[in-house]
């Protein structure tokens, strides 16, 4: 009855959960996901990178690709298959509480750097022992919340939607 676990922190815990799943009547492996927005930072002993807004200041797509690739390798070593990153919301209000998770305010840069990170995580088809599934977040216009309040209403004109969020 359980199909996935979030934030499993050790390989031993992941192996135990997989063992339980494989001994169940359906024998379907469990999908394990973790929020690895700047490396697999929730897991002890893994590489922790600067927050995405800091990484974006490099303007170096290949650097974000390599971070995605290394993070995927460390995630798989601890039993995870799926990451809830990158955040490709376009930063529109610096008061927003998720600024650090974003890749900035420039749609071109966010698109390129987000794609590089996704490609690093998945390395083409995301099958294999050193690749993970990237879950891009959030919704279009997520960085447009009124007064910078997370999950608040957004007032987005068609022009802003087309020029900023759907270039």
Predicted regions span which residues?
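Glycoside hydrolase catalytic-domain context in secreted enzymes
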Residues: 1-167
């Amino acid at each position: 009855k359980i199909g996935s676990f979030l934030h499993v922190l050790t390989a031993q815990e992941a192996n135990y959960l997989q063992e339980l799943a494989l001994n169940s009547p359906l024998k379907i492996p469990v999908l394990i996901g973790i929020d690895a927005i700047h490396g697999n930072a929730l897991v002890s002993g893994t590489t922790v990178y600067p927050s995405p807004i800091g990484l974006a200041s490099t303007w170096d797509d290949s650097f974000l690709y390599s971070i995605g690739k290394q993070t995927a390798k460390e995630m798989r070593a601890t039993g995870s298959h799926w990451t809830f990153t990158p955040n490709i919301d376009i930063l529109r209000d610096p008061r927003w509480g998720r600024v650090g998770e974003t890749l900035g305010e420039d749609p071109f840069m966010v698109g390129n750097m987000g794609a590089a990170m996704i490609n690093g995580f998945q390395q083409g088809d995301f099958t294999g022992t050193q690749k993970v599934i990237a879950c891009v977040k959030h919704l279009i216009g997520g960085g447009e919340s009124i007064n910078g309040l997370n999950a608040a209403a957004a007032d987005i004109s068609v022009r802003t939607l087309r020029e900023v969020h759907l270039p």
